[in-house]
């Protein structure tokens, strides 16, 4: 995931979809820690001092401990378990281009118009409690998440990256891409 993020970091905003609340913080912290270890953290921080101040103040304001840990480094998290105030704070910071990378559950795929140039879907299986097993995401869910990339009113092109098991590759390659502004050059 880190290498895919680094291909776009500093150039475009990135929205990463994970499939659990816990995974949002885990992924954001992994990206932050990896960037720190590889001395690339500056790529994720806003270029202006004013924007860095906005993130520092937002981190102090946030209720969610994981969000506080990540915000000041240019990473955000978003899921339904956060307070409404924290979710709105993250949405505003991402819309204002203060946050470079936002890791979210599908809460941002439905009902919130928050586009990004690059969308990464980290994993394609979700746990279905009714079936008591892991199931592949539906084509509708996949397209809804990928539809956050390169929205016409915000960008001229978008990139969707799907990280999945090799045996599921053909399934995702066969999905109809109904968004003419979206390209899917990378599927892992």
Question: Over which residues does each language-model region extend?
Answer:
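Conserved interdomain linker/interface between the two RecA-like ATPase lobes of SF2 helicase motors
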Residues: 1-25
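Conserved small/polar residues in nucleotide/adenosyl-binding loops
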Residues: 180-186
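Conserved nucleotide-binding/hydrolysis micro-motifs of P-loop NTPases
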Residues: 21-24, 82-83, 108-110, 125-127, ...
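Conserved C-terminal RecA-like helicase domain
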Residues: 22-101, 134-140
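Short glycine-/polar-rich loops that comprise or flank the Walker A/P-loop
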Residues: 11-12, 72-73, 115-118, 155-160
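Conserved segment of the helicase C-terminal RecA-like domain
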Residues: 138-173
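Conserved RecA-like helicase motor core of SF1/SF2 enzymes
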Residues: 96-100, 106-148
């Amino acid at each position: 995931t880190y290498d895919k993020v680094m291909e776009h970091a500093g150039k475009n905003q990135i929205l990463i979809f994970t499939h659990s609340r816990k995974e949002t913080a885990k992924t954001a912290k992994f990206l932050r820690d990896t960037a720190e270890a590889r001395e690339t953290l500056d790529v994720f921080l806003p270029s202006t001092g004013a924007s860095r101040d906005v993130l520092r103040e937002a981190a102090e304001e946030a209720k969610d401990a994981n969000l506080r840990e990540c915000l000041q480094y240019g990473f955000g998290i978003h899921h339904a378990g956060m307070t409404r105030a924290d979710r709105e704070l993250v949405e505003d910071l991402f819309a204002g281009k203060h946050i470079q990378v936002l890791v979210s559950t599908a809460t941002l795929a439905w009902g919130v118009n928050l586009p990004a140039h690059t969308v990464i879907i980290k994993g394609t299986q979700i746990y279905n409690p009714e079936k008591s097993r892991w199931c592949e995401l539906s084509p509708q869910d996949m397209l809804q998440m990928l539809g956050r990339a390169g929205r016409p009113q915000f960008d001229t092109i978008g990139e969707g990256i799907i990280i999945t098991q090799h045996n599921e590759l053909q399934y995702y390659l066969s999905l109809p891409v109904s968004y003419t502004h979206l390209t899917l050059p990378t599927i892992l």
